[in-house]
Design a protein with these regions (language model features):
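Active-site-adjacent structural elements that line small-molecule/cofactor binding pockets in enzymes
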Residues: 1-124
């Protein structure tokens, strides 16, 4: 989240390079995007180190249970239009990120969707 980015930058200091990752789902249907996000995050939700980090960011156990609350999924996987997604990426830069790596979230096996997402947000 951009909040985590700001916390990391405050620890590293202004001169250090900070690369962060943001899961991106180029999908305007929130229910579809959340379903894809839940599938993507499922493996992380059982890992204690991830849960501790998310709890330290203000999420609750309830946010992390049962596949993740909508609030949690929306925070971890930005979705919507290109403009909506770009705003979240910009929030990371505003919070001190030097680089934001996007991780496409898409239907399993749909590499064309991943390529469309990467191309849409590629620099230059």
């Amino acid at each position: 989240t951009p909040e985590h980015t700001a916390r990391a930058k405050s620890i590293l200091g202004p001169e250090k390079w900070l690369a962060v990752e943001q899961k991106v789902c180029l999908e305007e249907s929130s229910s579809t995007a959340r379903a894809l996000g839940r599938a993507e995050l499922e493996r992380y939700l059982v890992l204690p180190n991830y849960r501790r980090c998310w709890l330290s960011l203000g999420f609750t156990e309830a946010d992390l249970d049962d596949g993740g609350s909508d609030r949690f999924i929306d925070a971890m996987v930005v979705s919507g239009s290109m403009d909506q997604i770009q705003r979240r990426l910009d929030e990371h830069f505003d919070a001190g990120a030097t680089h934001v790596c996007i991780q496409p979230v898409h239907p399993a096996g749909d590499l064309a969707a991943a390529e469309r997402t990467l191309e849409a947000f590629a620099p230059g």
